[in-house]
């Protein structure tokens, strides 16, 4: 039977620089049924330069015309919050991990005993960071996003060179939000086959269709941005799923796993009881005297399933009754002179 994927709620910027909102979000994520909350661990200065020059102004995205440094100021999770959020998640029995964006971020997360690390696709070229994360011997999650085939191969090979083989590769479209027609979910499975790793989905589409479909394709992890409610205006609110949507998605994913069931064809034990009443069997429809021939006029396949299997119908035509057979009774092998 297919195992349900681990479901990760990405908090990202949806705390809106409010620690209480972040904590409230963790409570809601737990209630939604998610397995993990994921943070992003960085400071603006480890991401970019504080420059107003044109190369540092974003073009053609959800954050069009915003300055990179200022965007990361709004979106970052303050480092001083991390210990408190990790402690709260553990009290809630909610898994928690993060994406480090620098060696310093990784050191902080190690001090908090972060159980696994995700490397964002934008960081796939930072082989030094990937190696340091892999050397912790904790599970490594990579995101395809903007990464080329070669970059993914380099990152995976690096993990394996330091004897870290617990690798999950998440199919990701780095568009915010991304379109259903760009999801290309079949490639998620192919990536897993090519690189010999577990695979999953980091989803930026609107709604739960792609996560549910990815589940049916065997995804081991589903990641989706979570926001407490859609009235909040955050850098990530446009492509994040609110509490009600997330809870419904989690339930739909669980139901899809149940619906897939097992590969081995079999009759469901719960339906076997129905067979007794609704499957046909052979019945005597007119009184038959001992020694009288069985014919189309005195036996017939009818419900319920109390007599001989209808597959014997033609075989017994012309054979003789071994005793008096009363109408409206099931026909058994003992009722026929020559036993079947």
Curated annotation (Swiss-Prot):
Classification via Pfam families: NeuB, SAF
Residue intervals of the AFP-like domain: 281-337
Enzyme class: transferase
GO biological process, one term: glycosylation
Chain ranges passing through the membrane: none
InterPro entries on file: AFP_Neu5c_C, AFP_Neu5c_C_sf, Aldolase_TIM, Neu5Ac_N, Nonulosonic_Acid_Synth, Pseudaminic_synth_PseI, SAF
Catalytic activity: 2,4-diacetamido-2,4,6-trideoxy-beta-L-altrose + phosphoenolpyruvate + H2O = pseudaminate + phosphate
Coiled coil: none
PANTHER family (alphabetical): N-ACETYLNEURAMINATE SYNTHASE, PSEUDAMINIC ACID SYNTHASE
NCBIfam families: PseI
Protein name according to UniProt: Pseudaminic acid synthase
